[in-house]
Amino acid sequence: MSDIQEPLKTVIQILHDSHKGFMDIGEHLKDQQARSFFLQEASTRHTFERELKTAVGADEDVGGTVAGPVHRAWGDLKANLGGGDHTLLATAEQGEDAAKKAYEEALKSDKLPGNVRELLIRQQGHIRQAHDRVRMMRDAKAA
């Protein structure tokens, strides 16, 4: 991929990972409201990934990051060790931190086509809101 597409490839990979991560964590959460949010968010991330791939003409096989499977496995491991919802929510927040950073890096490029920039800005707004909601859920479970 060209140098303007490399940060976009990272965003696509993060979206792929977060789709899987939200799905995996959502399936382990005991809190039904959090579970519902996570499963819906998994669907949203899948949609975002498809939108961005279409906008930039990316192959279907971009795949996830090397850290993605490790991130998901760590969340599963903590759940299996009895870490519970708080630990899963903390894991998700770490993933959301990576997503926020990926969007920030991609948007630094002054070579992005207008339609791609607009798409990233729209998606980034949602990512920030989701991050804040995950953090609030995590903090509520810590109390």
Q: Where are these predicted regions, by residue range?
A:
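General structural signal for alpha-helix termini and helix-helix connectors
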Residues: 24, 28, 54, 58, ...
